[in-house]
Design a protein with these regions (language model features):
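Glycine-rich, aromatic-lined ligand/substrate-binding cores of catalytic
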Residues: 193-275
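A short helix->loop->beta-strand "cap" motif at the edges of active sites that frequently abuts
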Residues: 94-96, 121-123, 239
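C-terminal glycine/acidic-rich active-site capping loop/insertion
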Residues: 230, 235, 264-345, 380
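N-terminal Rossmann-like dinucleotide-binding module
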Residues: 1-47, 326
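C-terminal helix-rich "cap/oligomerization" subdomain common to oxidoreductases
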Residues: 66, 324-380
Length: 380
């Protein structure tokens, strides 16, 4: 693991997700830019002292020098955004598989270079767009693909939080500090979780953006980065979309939801109540899909661990991304063909699309105009 030192929220989440299904064990890390903190975190995880590194560069070199049976099989990158690119590059160039937090990078140039490096070195690269791991999101994706909604006409995705409704970064709070720092975050609400909204819309509907118009704001006085954005989107095939993301919605915790309206039916899913997927018809009762039932598509069944009526949540969704990627990595190491179901995870090309979306939305917000949002990342 690179990142995830003392006091970091996301590092522990990544570790629990990676180990939930017994497919991986943490054996090495460069957990902090402060060597003392990296050692402290390594001790907390019970790692051998010679596998705890001071920098990601030292770790990439050190692990590559070990025999194949001893070195890491893949690396989790859970640093602030500005370190995703150099960390991933260092490991990819040495042939290591990578699972990286989002957004992929802070610039499109870096994102595209990672796409080319992944293809050149033929490594597995997974991006943790966590919400794509929920079983009911996979069910929604399958329903849209099967034509259960008819032709998609409208997509509405909301992602609202309220934790930055005040200048929390001025109090010394660690997460608020780096997430509102343009040098480390790259972008604010759009980069932090607007990319989740963009990816969720694309993942569920299969539709790519063509044009967008963004109203991007900084609501908290003195803040150096956007904290609220509202976007109108034109998708391929004529569908229209509304995406909005906000960090200043007082009282909201993690309100991510998606509604998709087709010519014959619609669906709705809420991340804060993730075990229910609603499908509505104009002339019949509402259908409610729930995990743990045999009528669900294989991808939704694969992502469910408990019997019906036993709620699962964010950690399990996170683990679904990890476990799929890890099974593909294991198949690659064994020289086997992976199960097609395991290929259902966000990739480096999804990451590049997310970075392109961020920059396109910010440009539209700055210029006050509709902009071309179509994009085909390299590395196909």
């Amino acid at each position: 693991m690179v990142g995830g030192g003392p006091g970091a929220f996301i590092g522990a989440v990544h570790n629990r997700a990676a180990t939930l299904d017994g497919l991986a064990v943490l054996v090495a890390g460069a957990f902090s830019s402060d060597p003392a903190k990296s050692r402290e975190q390594g001790e907390a995880y019970g790692l051998a002292s010679n596998r705890v590194y001071s920098t990601f560069e030292e770790m990439a070199i050190g692990e590559a020098a070990l025999p194949p049976g001893e070195r890491i099989d893949f690396v989790s990158i859970v640093t602030p955004n500005h370190l995703h690119f150099p960390s991933a590059k260092a490991f990819i160039e040495r042939g290591f598989h990578v699972i990286c937090d989002k957004p992929l990078t802070t610039t499109l140039e870096d994102a595209e270079e990672l796409c080319r490096l992944v293809k050149k070195h033929d490594v597995v690269f997974a991006l943790t767009h966590t919400y794509a791991g929920y079983p009911m999101v996979k069910q929604a994706r399958a329903l849209v693909a099967a034509g259960a909604l008819g032709t998609v006409r409208k997509i509405v995705v909301e992602y609202s939080q309220g934790w930055l409704a005040t200048p929390l970064e001025q109090t010394g709070q660690k997460q608020a500090g780096w997430r509102t720092d343009p040098a480390r975050a790259g972008a604010g609400a759009i980069g932090d979780f607007g990319t989740h909204a963009e990816h969720l819309a694309k993942y569920v509907t299969g539709l790519e953006m063509e044009r967008l118009f963004a109203d991007v704001s900084t609501m908290v006085p003195g803040r150096r980065i956007d904290d609220d954005a509202n976007m109108l989107v034109h998708y391929q095939g004529g569908a229209k979309g509304i995406l909005f993301c906000s960090q200043i919605s007082v009282g909201e915790e993690n309100r991510l939801s998606i509604r998709v309206y087709g010519t014959s039916a619609s669906l709705e899913w809420h991340q804060e109540d993730p075990n229910f997927l609603y499908v509505r018809h104009p002339d019949g009762p509402t259908e409610v899909y729930k995990p743990g039932h045999a009528h669900l598509v294989p991808a939704a069944q694969r992502g469910t661990r408990m019997p019906a009526g036993h709620p699962e949540g964010l950690l399990e969704s996170f683990a679904n991304i990890y476990s799929s990627a890890m099974r593909v990595i294991r198949a690659r190491i064994a020289g086997e063909t992976p199960d097609p179901l395991d290929l259902d995870f966000p990739t480096v090309r999804d990451g590049a699309s997310g970075v392109h979306f961020i920059q396109t939305a910010l440009r539209s917000g700055r210029d006050g105009t509709w902009v071309d949002a179509s994009y085909d990342p390299p590395g196909r």
